[in-house]
Amino acid sequence: MKSRRIICIVNDIWENSDEVWGFNTFRENGYCVEIWRVGALTIGTKIWEKPQFSYPVITIESKKELDSKILKMSLYKPIYLFYFSESKYFDKEKALIKLLGGKYCNVSIGPLGSRDNHLQLREVMSRKRHWMDNFLATYNFLAAEIHKCGLHSKFEAEYENNIMIHTYDYDYYLRNQNSKSKCGKEYILFYDQNFLEHKDIINYGIKRRITNEKVYIKEISNLLLKIEMEYGLPVVIAAHPTSKNANLKKIYGSREIIYGKTCEYTKNAKWVVTCASGAINYAVLYKKPILFWTCYQIKNSDIYFEWQCIRCNILKAKILDISDNLKGNIQNYLTNPDNYEKFMNYITSNPNEKRLFFDIVVGYLNKM
C-alpha cells in the first residue's frame, strides 16, 4: 500500500520545524510529507531559512504557481495542511481543493497573537454566514478557543470538526515534565528577543524597534545589574533562536547564555524577565512570577507595545519602564501566579491532556 501524501503549507520553516510542526510524527505514522513555503505571498518573506531536514521543500512565489501545483497534485489526492493562525489567506485555493475532490485542514498551534484577538472573534461571531462555509476544512485543529478569531463566520466557529488542542509551547511543557536544569544553582531567567537583528524586521517590513543600540544596551545592563544586586542571584539569558552569539555577548556580557532550553530553564528559575516574549507561556505553565519591562524605544515602535499590553492586561501585570529611573522596588512589578488561570485558556484547551499536538492530529487524519 502506497503512503498517503501530506502537503504542509507554511510561511517558512525553521531548524526544529520537523519536530514542532509534526512532520516527523506524520512520517512515523506512514505519511509522505512535502512542504510548500508561501511566506512570499502572506507576509512578504525576503529571507528564507535553509532547510535543516530531509523533507522535500518547495518555495512558492505566486498564487498562479500555487494554483498550478494544486491542480497537478489533485491526481494524488493529498491531504493539505494550512499552518496559519488565520485561515483566510488562501480561501480560493481551499475552495479549489474541495472542488477537485480533495481535502484540507487548518492548523493553528501558535501562542496568543499581537492583535486584539477578542475583537476579531466578536466580528467572526457576528457574521452568521460566509461563502467559505460551503468549502469548510475537514478539520480545524486549533490551539485554543481564541484561535477561532481566524475563522470566517459564526457557522464555522460552531463547526463540529473544530478540534481544540493546545499550543506548541504546551508540547514542550509535556516533553520537559521530568527534566532538570544543568545550572546547578538558583537563578533568574531573562528571555532574549533579539531586538537588534531579528530577520522579521526585514521580512515583515516593520521599522526597527531599537534605533539607538548604545542606549538600549545600557538600559538592559542597568536592569540586569539591579536584579542581581537586589536578589543576590545570577541572571541567565535564554537566547532567542535567531540571536547570534556576538550580539548576545555585546548586550549581556559574561552572563550564562543557553540555547534551545527555555522551557527546561523556566521550570527551574526563581522567576523570569521579559518584554513580551511568547515564552511567557512556560512561566505561566510553571507558575513563575514574571517581570515585564519596556523602554522608550519599544513604546514608540510599531505594534509591539500593544502586543505587550494585551498580555499584561490578561495577567494583571505592571510594566517596568527601564528608560525611567530604576529606583523603585522590582518586587512590586512581579506578577502574581494566582492571576494566571485566564491566560491558561490561551495555552491549552485541556490542562489534563498528556498527548502531543500532532499525535492528536494524526488520529483524525487517519480517519480521512
Q: Where are the model-predicted features located?
A:
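Active-site and donor-binding regions of nucleotide-sugar-utilizing enzymes
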Residues: I6-G30, I35-L174, A279-I280
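Short, flexible/disordered intra-domain loops and linkers
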Residues: G44-Y55, N117-V124, E197-V215, N300-E306
